[in-house]
């Protein structure tokens, strides 16, 4: 599935309270439009597939900038 066709998924805010970036152990932000969890500190975007966050650095997309 491409980013353009990623389904809009609602993420439980409680999930964001307990999930952290596996690289930095820092907080994550949810990008609903792209269906990703964002680690600003690591500059990585972790995909959400079929409602499941894929928290593997090798599966993450590098953020530009």
UniProtKB/Swiss-Prot annotation:
InterPro entries to which the protein is assigned, alphabetical: Trm112-like (IPR005651)
Matching Gene3D superfamilies: 2.20.25.10
GO cellular component: cytosol
Pfam families in alphabetical order: Trm112p
PANTHER family xrefs: PROTEIN PREY, MITOCHONDRIAL, ZGC:162634
Family designation: Belongs to the UPF0434 family.
Listed name of the protein: UPF0434 protein CCNA_00107
Taxonomic lineage from the root: Bacteria, Pseudomonadati, Pseudomonadota, Alphaproteobacteria, Caulobacterales
């Amino acid at each position: 599935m491409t980013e353009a066709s990623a389904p809009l998924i609602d993420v439980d805010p409680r999930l964001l309270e307990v999930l952290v970036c596996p690289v930095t152990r820092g907080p994550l932000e949810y990008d609903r439009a792209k269906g990703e969890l964002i680690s600003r500190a690591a500059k990585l975007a972790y995909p959400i597939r079929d409602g499941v966050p894929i928290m593997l650095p090798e599966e993450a997309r590098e953020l530009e900038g």
